[in-house]
Structures are given as structure tokens and as C-alpha cells.
Amino acid sequence: MDEEAGITPELIEVRADERFDEARIAAYLRNRVPGSDLPLTVRQFARGKANLTYLLTYGDPRTPAREYVLRRPPLGPVAPGSHDMGREYRVLSTLWRAFPLAARAYLFCDDESVLGAPFFVMERRRGVVVQGVIPPEFGGGEDAGANRKLSEVVVDTLAEFHAVDPDSAGLGDLGYPEGFMQRQLQGWLGRWGRARHEPNSLVDELSVWLEETMPTSPGPTLLHNDWRLDNMAVDPGDPGRCVAVYDWDMCTRGDPFADVGTLMACWFDRDEQSIFLDPMPTRSRGFMTRREAILRYGRKSGRDVSNMNWYLVFGTFKLAVILQQIYIRWLRGQTRDERFSNMGKDAATLFEMAADRRSA
């Protein structure tokens, strides 16, 4: 893949500060996963800004006998309840039976003396991950038909996932679906309160609106909690065929529209103001509009989507708070990365967008 075209390569050599003792890992995994008696080669997946993901290749890397993926939390202190490798392992050790697009997890290790953090090992799925730029496999953004398929597959696969019976997946006791959205809203309002650095009447008004207009949740389903196109892999020969869904560490049970709102918050229409990050290439010719995507989810899932604006606004509000949290760390001198110096403006833009989307 071409980095100059804005496309991140899939695999890189392990970053210097994210290396681990490969011999120790090889010794630990020997006889614990099939094929682990062969020589081990480790590379790192370039995508992802939180949990660290590595490719474990056993045998000749050109014709590997076995490939696995190792996942661990990011370096440094981790907030309680976040980057939960045990949770992700639990989900992936059983979900694949009911939802084959979830990779199968084989092993979990919470002995931090092995790697320095909990980790788990799962199967590798091969496919194309589409981030902010459409890769050349799918026409580089110029193929409207391929773009349409990409926009459809991310919606259709979400509806398929929400149709999974939690009990049949062995996850009927996951999370606490009762009062899920109320807890979510109060949690994010609290994060905003801790990250704000000056009065903001627009966000105050938006917060009241979110509290006063929260709709009644439909029946609970399994939730991914970070459903986006760049958390999926698609068949390189068919952009309309998903081969894997990634990043399950926040999976729980709750309101299915929370997933839709997260997805739609990242779904920018062509006439909307651009911000520094467009996590999905939804402005590309041929992509469904956000409204078309919402209606398609309603048809595919059989759910009434007439209250989806609330979830769209809340999803956009969450994006804004995330940027504000990063900005306040820069403002307080907790990070010196100058890329974060403008995130306060970007957060303000997203708060304005959230307010506008109340009537979208």
C-alpha cells in the first residue's frame, strides 16, 4: 500500500518502543497453540491507535505454516475498564460460533511477567481494511459501484450482527443492558465536565437536550461499541463481502441503536463541513448518504429508525468529547504533541455539528 496516497501499510516492523521479548513469547506459546514448535517471526499491524496488534508467523514467512494475531493493551497506564483483553478474549472465544465474521480466539494470558501486560492470541483473517482513503484494490475512490458496495456492507453486516441471539453465542450474561443508554449518557457528560476548559453555552444546551429527549431503547442486542468501516476487513476481490470484524474489547449487551449512532456520527455527507479526520471515506462518489444508510439499516434489521437522530447527535457528541479530552491533555502540558494543539477547535466544530444534526 502507498503511504504517500494516505494509505497505511498493513504490516510494519515492530516499533522500537512497542517491542517485547519474542523468545519469551515463543517459549510461552510452544505447545499451547498448533504449529508453535516452528520458528517464530513477529511483525506489527500498523492500524489502530489504542490496543497493539502483532502478527505471529510460524515457519517460513513467505509460506507460513501458521499465522496468529496477538493483541495487548497500549503502553503506559490504562484506565479501569478500558482495553480489556480478558473481555475481548471471552467474546472472541465463543462469538465465532454464532457470528463467523468474528475471529476465533485461542488463548488468554493474564500473567504480566510474560509480556508486561495481559494479552490474547486469535486466528488471522486476511482482507482489506478501508480507512479514510479507499485503497487501489477498490478503485482508489473513483469506482462509484465499489464505493456503494462498501457503504452497504458496513450497514448490512451491522444488522446481521444485531440479529445474533446472545444466548446462542454464549454471551447471554454479558454486560448490564438495563439502563444502558442512561449510563452511557451520564458517563460522557461527566467526561465532558472533566475536559472542559472554559464556559460553553452550546454544549450546555446540547447536554440538556440529550437528557430531556432520550428515546426509549428497543430490546437489547449484542453491541460492538465501535462499529466503523475501518474495524472491518473486506474481500479484496469483492468490496461488498465482509470477511472479518475487529476490535471487540468494548463488546456488551445494550441498545442496538448505540452502534448505529456511533457509525452514523462518522458518516459525513458531502455537504457537511470537513474536520481534520474523516474516519470513513463516506464523501466518495457512490457512497450512500447518511440518511440512506439509516433507512437501509431499518430495512435490514426490521427496526423502527424514526428516533435515530438522538443517537446520531449523541454519537457526534462523543466524538467531540474524545477530541476535547486529547486537547485538554495538550493544554495542561500532559503531552507535547503539537498535532493536538488544534483539537480544541475540531471539538468545537463537532459540537456545532452535533447541534445541527438534531434536525438532520
Q: Residue ranges of each PLM-predicted region?
A:
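Helical subdomain adjoining the active site within ATP-dependent kinase catalytic cores
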Residues: 303-307, 321-360
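Active-site activation/catalytic loop segments of kinase-like enzymes and analogous catalytic loops
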Residues: 258-301, 315-332
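Hydrophobic residue at the +6 position relative to the catalytic HRD Asp in the kinase catalytic loop
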Residues: 232-234
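Activation of the activation-loop gatekeeper triad in protein kinase-fold domains
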Residues: 246-251
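ATP-binding pocket architecture of kinase catalytic cores
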Residues: 39-222, 237-240
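Juxta-kinase regulatory segment immediately upstream of eukaryotic protein kinase catalytic domains
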Residues: 2-36
